[in-house]
Amino acid sequence: MIHKSLSELQEEIDTYINGFEEGYFPPMELLARLTEELGELSREVQHVHGMKKKKPGEAVRSLEEETGDLFFVLVCFANSQGISLEKALTTVVEKFKVRDANRWTKKEEL
């Protein structure tokens, strides 16, 4: 399996999307699609971990597939807005490390 950085994935998706005349959807359309994909992931989580089981004949989808769909649209949104996901995620991880440094009970080191 080939492992790619967030930057490489963003570049690959950008090349793919820009291969079409239409290019990226407008921001509000991408936001609506993010919401749609999050709803589909939520439904699968309910089927796997919740009380709501699939109806007979309902399509089987995996949490991995639905997470991938959501992430693809998120990358499209980030690309369309010129956002580096590596930079954004690095910044937020550092924010959480500082903000929540003493918020949770730490596991004892072995």
Task: Give the label of every model feature segment.
Residues 1-67, 71-110:
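Flexible "arm" and connector segments at domain edges
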